[in-house]
Amino acid sequence: MPNDEHLAVLRGGAAAWNAWCAENRGTADLAQAGLRGLDLRGYDLSRADLRGADLRGTNFSGANLSGARLEGANVFKAVFDDADLTGAFLYGAQFLNCAQLGATRNWQSAFRDGDLACGASIPDRPN
């Protein structure tokens, strides 16, 4: 279950969220959150726990998702244009495809399943 405080700050807009993240360097707990269709352009979601979240149609354009955990999240029709996926965990992300990955930055370093090789080597799964 997601942290209610984290959800409230997230819904307050990118400026409020990014300021909160700068002060609270821990992991944002948004696991299993219902974030369907939200506009999260430019949000700093680095290291956020989005495992199992409903992210259908969510706009992550320009967002920082480095080190974020998206395992098992539903990203059907989510937009990732110019999002940073450095070291993101994408194992089991539902409906993720190579076209979505190709629109991002640093996707080659994201930890992902073999069906998302998309012409690049897959980093070894971390312990």
Annotate each predicted stretch with a short phrase:
Residues 5-8, 12-127:
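Tandem repeat scaffolds
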